[in-house]
Structure formats: structure tokens, C-alpha cells
Amino acid sequence: MERAIFAGGCFWCMVQPFEELDGIVSVRSGYTGGHVPNPSYEQVCSKTTGHTEAVEIIFDPQKIDYSDLVELYWQQTDPTDAFGQFEDRGDNYRPVIFYFDERQKEIAEQSRENLQLSGRFQDPIVTQIEEAQPFYLAEDYHQAFYRKNPERYAQSSKQRHDFLEENWH
């Protein structure tokens, strides 16, 4: 099994698209990239930990390639917004692809370059590609939030949904 970590705004909205793919073992919400060990949601929201909300994906590389996950990642985000995603603002919502090895780094960088050259977006692609840091699981109530709270999930993801429909579908 291999790991991938993606940050694309509120982690609630990043779980379902990946969970639905064949070859995915698990998708868990959490925090990474900061300097405070085992942060709470409240600490991360205070913007004092350096962490960003992210999802950790465990996948079977015999069934799905990392490059496929990166392509799906782009389609869940606004890669031109470095200061958060949609209605979620601040460093704790910044878009980042975290890599575990040189292969993942190269795939992510090439994919970002291809997206920039595609002309899909007029603004520069600003999503960061950074070395993976320790990943801390979010509290249980955040896990699989879209299944536990479908109405709240739909409300919180409307702006994202509208952007994705307009720019990716």
C-alpha cells in the first residue's frame, strides 16, 4: 500500500471523491504541515499551529496510480487560490500536495506544469508541492463527515460545487 496526502480547503469536501475510487483503502481527515504535535480542530482553526486541513489516502498502487489521484485532486480545488479554498480562508485551508518520495514529487510537479500550460486557468497555478510532514488524525466527528451530516455537508460545499461545475466539468 502507498500513501498520499492532499490539502484542498475544508477536509470534509476532500473525502468523498477519493473514497469512491477503486483501489482506495482509506481516506482520513486530519492536519499536517505545522509545528504543533497532535493539534485539535480548535487549535488549527486559530491559525497558530501552521497546520492545514488535509486528507490522508491509503491506496493500492496495483489498482490505481498516484498520478490518477493527483489528477482527481486538481478537479476538487481552485489551484489559483493560495489563501484558502472557496468559503474557507487562511493558511489552514491552503492547497498543497504533500509528497512522500521523489517519484510523487516529480508526478505532482509535472502535473502542475501541465495544468498551467493547458490554459484552463488564466491565473497562475499556485498550489504548493511540499514534503510530507507528520499527519495527525482529526477528531472522530470530522471523519466521513459527508455521510454523517449530508445536509450540513451540502450547505458547506455549495461554493466549491459551483466552481467545480463551471471549471472542471
From Swiss-Prot:
Pfam families with a match to the protein in the record: PMSR
GO molecular function terms listed in the Swiss-Prot or TrEMBL record: L-methionine:thioredoxin-disulfide S-oxidoreductase activity; peptide-methionine (S)-S-oxide reductase activity
Naturally occurring in which organism (per UniProt): Streptococcus uberis (strain ATCC BAA-854 / 0140J)
NCBIfam families: msrA
Family statement drawn from the similarity comment of this UniProt entry: Belongs to the MsrA Met sulfoxide reductase family.
Listed InterPro entries: Met_Sox_Rdtase_MsrA_dom, Met_Sox_Rdtase_MsrA_sf
Active site, UniProt feature: 10
EC number: 1.8.4.11
Keywords: Oxidoreductase
UniProt protein name: Peptide methionine sulfoxide reductase MsrA
GO BP terms: protein modification process
Superkingdom of the source species: Bacteria
Role, per record: Has an important function as a repair enzyme for proteins that have been inactivated by oxidation. Catalyzes the reversible oxidation-reduction of methionine sulfoxide in proteins to methionine.
Top-level EC class as recorded in UniProt: oxidoreductase
Catalysed reactions, as listed in the record: L-methionyl-[protein] + [thioredoxin]-disulfide + H2O = L-methionyl-(S)-S-oxide-[protein] + [thioredoxin]-dithiol; [thioredoxin]-disulfide + L-methionine + H2O = L-methionine (S)-S-oxide + [thioredoxin]-dithiol
